[in-house]
Amino acid sequence: MSNQYNIDVDKLKEKAIEIYNEVYAPKFGDKYLQDFIDEVIKYCLNLLQNRELNNDSTQSEKLHDITVKNILSPTYNGKAIEALAQARTIGEFDPLSRIIKIQGINIFSPNSVKTIGVGTAKIFRYAVTAFTKLNHPNTPSNKIKLRVYLDLNDYAQANGQDITLSEKRRNFRRKIKNDLEKLKQAGVSGEEKIQGKPRRYVGLNYIGKYDIKGDSIMVEFTLGMAEYLVSLPMISYPRSLYSLSDNDANTFAMAEILCRQNSIDNNVLRGTHGRLRIETILKYLSFPTYDELQEKNNIRRWREYVKSPFENCLEKLYQCGFLKDYRYAHDGGGAELTDEEAANINSYGEFVSLILWYELNGFDDTATRAKAITEKRAEKMKKLTQARRKKKSNTDNQ
């Protein structure tokens, strides 16, 4: 690896090992150590290039913060998972059936819509990420590892919680237990396109069992949920999102949508992975629609009810380290709005028609990602071609 910034790579490796031993070694041993070191060096050189880290910062606490906060983890992602994050923002609860309806996904909740919140979505996402490490895509049913173990201290750190004091630790454990109980009781039904084919699922329980002993959290997925998970595509999920407040459902739902858009391979190849129409994002948030504003005679206060809270969400995502940059642009050519133009948007319609351009921390540049995707697809096609030729050769020789 080139080192045009005269950075002391050996000291950087030492710091990376120190961070790994503190955060990840208790769970994974040395299994991911070298991958972690490589990612830290690549990430820090990228920060140096963008002047976000000084050369003398390689031994500082800043390295610890940016590394742990922005670490990316591959995780399975589908509508049944995203629905948990959207239950508090756009979920419609039917008290008779005890079902939360979320854009074609139905979650049966034995109590009420308020039982499914950001904390519930976060612990499930955290468990799915651990499951992803154990089970590769399309793992046969009889080989799926259903049980994962999570570290209480690591999860607390990811959430930005200091649980050193015994009372705080008890409260944090109690909250996790409550969220896991909700997941055990909740069932999800819906239909989505997976690997190009429509797939329907009915009454899948999110988890089957859980247990918390000491600092270890055991989560066991049901076989049905596990089979669903290994059929899904993966996204790269930033650790920084766990630090968002459990009380801020809109910011969390926005982050998950931006993360999904950024992780789709075809979007990267088309160059659309870092932009979304504001109108599209608003469909997943609980801000009032145009019709709702008109109905309550509040259309003139659209900035107060929509634009300001929308921008507050963006700022929180920037502050937590998820967003590297964001800006508004006009549709089509993508001409960026100046600060003055952004401040003087005249109407609700004009605002929602804008495009949000954004960059996420921790990801390679577009060209590097596109090259990696193209090479991966070419390798996959090569293997498929070789397999077909081998099969044909065996048939011809019979």
Across the structure, where does each feature detected by a protein language model lie?
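Charged, alpha-helix-forming regions
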Residues: 1-398
